[in-house]
Amino acid sequence: MLVPKRVKYRREFRGNMRGRAKGGTEVAFGEYGLQAVEASWITNRQIEAARIAMTRYMKRGGKVWIKIFPHKSYTSKPIGVRMGKGKGAPEGWVSPVKRGKIMFEIAGVPEDVAREALRLAAHKLPVKTKIVKREEIGGEANES
């Protein structure tokens, strides 16, 4: 399970999820990627479930890159406790994902296997996604 080794503050503000992702919007390492179409918090358990679904389908072949990390803690108060009296205890870890962010990348497997593995991973996540293919940049290398 992915969790930070140490954090400066145990409790964080919730923040807002407006707009598109600043970075990580293109497939950088692998051949195929799973891109978020909407914004959401993704927990460390959901990331792990998606990773297991992909690697099991690929039969341990190929390589998987996880491009999101759950660095933000979320809190909740116990059931039956009245409002106020401070912020609740840290409950778990989430990764805030904005629109356009590539969450997972795959390489080293055929296209049909990669697409099915990413589809299975998408079912484990609470966000609408699309599968994107790496775009080759430029035609020929500059020769000098």
UniProtKB/Swiss-Prot annotation:
Keyword terms, alphabetized: Ribonucleoprotein, Ribosomal protein, RNA-binding, rRNA-binding, tRNA-binding
Keyword Ribonucleoprotein belongs to the record: yes
Entry GO terms, CC: cytosolic large ribosomal subunit
MF (Gene Ontology): rRNA binding; structural constituent of ribosome; tRNA binding
NCBIfam families for this protein: rplP_bact
Family classification: Belongs to the universal ribosomal protein uL16 family.
Any one Gene Ontology BP term: translation
Assembly description: Part of the 50S ribosomal subunit.
Organism the protein comes from: Listeria monocytogenes serovar 1/2a (strain ATCC BAA-679 / EGD-e)
Protein name: Large ribosomal subunit protein uL16
Role noted for this protein: Binds 23S rRNA and is also seen to make contacts with the A and possibly P site tRNAs.
InterPro entries given in the database record: Ribosomal_uL16, Ribosomal_uL16_bact-type, Ribosomal_uL16_CS, Ribosomal_uL16_dom, Ribosomal_uL16_sf
Keyword RNA-binding: yes
